[in-house]
């Protein structure tokens, strides 16, 4: 069974999607990949994963880095999963470039070249926004590049993290 619930962030509402075992999606309502079937859903706060996700968001949007993980149900290609794994390791308040991710993947693949565009495509297919922090991936020279929720939200998320980032976060 699939469960849906809405959560209001300071930057716009998101839809939280999960099943009995894991979180499977977080989308801003303005996202270009917003799942159409989630348009008219009612809250289902009885689902433990939704409750934990909302707690995670409460902590995050209060300016702190949540200190617990959520069970993630990630679906995608092997390449996408590798990219999302690297993204998940980007520390709170920090950013990396598409090129840095491509270089890391290349090193993991015995030096086989990985294009920044392929990385960008995989980043764009992330279904669990904010929690898999694709907003922390930027273009060369600090340029703000695509974000499914919109560049404005990406900038706000990064600003929130930078304003509240400490070595202990």
Positions of PLM-derived features:
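Basic nucleic-acid-binding alpha-helical/helix-turn surface characteristic of O6-alkylguanine DNA
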Residues: 1-114, 160-169
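Gly/Ser/Thr-rich beta-alpha loop segments that engage phosphate groups in nucleotides
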Residues: 14, 95, 122, 126, ...
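Mobile beta-alpha loop/short-helix "lid" or hinge segments that flank ligand
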Residues: 23, 128-130
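Regulatory, non-catalytic segments
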Residues: 110-128
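Short Lys/Arg-enriched helix C-cap and helix-to-coil transition segments
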Residues: 130-137
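…primarily DNA-binding HTH/wHTH and HhH modules…
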Residues: 140-169
């Amino acid at each position: 069974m699939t469960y849906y619930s809405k959560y209001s962030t300071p930057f716009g509402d998101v839809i939280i999607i999960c099943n009995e075992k894991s979180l499977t999606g977080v989308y801003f309502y303005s996202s270009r990949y917003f799942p159409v079937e989630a348009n008219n859903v009612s809250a289902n706060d009885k689902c433990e994963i939704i409750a934990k996700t909302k707690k995670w968001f409460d902590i995050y949007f209060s300016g702190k880095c949540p200190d617990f993980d959520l069970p993630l149900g990630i679906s995608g290609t092997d390449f996408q999963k590798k990219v999302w794994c690297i993204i998940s390791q980007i520390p709170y308040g920090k950013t990396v470039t598409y090129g840095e991710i491509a270089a890391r993947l290349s090193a993991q693949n015995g030096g086989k070249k990985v294009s920044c565009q392929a990385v960008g495509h995989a980043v764009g297919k992330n279904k669990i926004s904010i929690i898999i922090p694709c907003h922390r991936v930027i273009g060369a020279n600090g340029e703000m590049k695509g974000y499914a929720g919109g560049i404005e939200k990406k900038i706000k998320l990064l600003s929130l993290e930078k304003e509240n980032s400490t070595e202990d976060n």
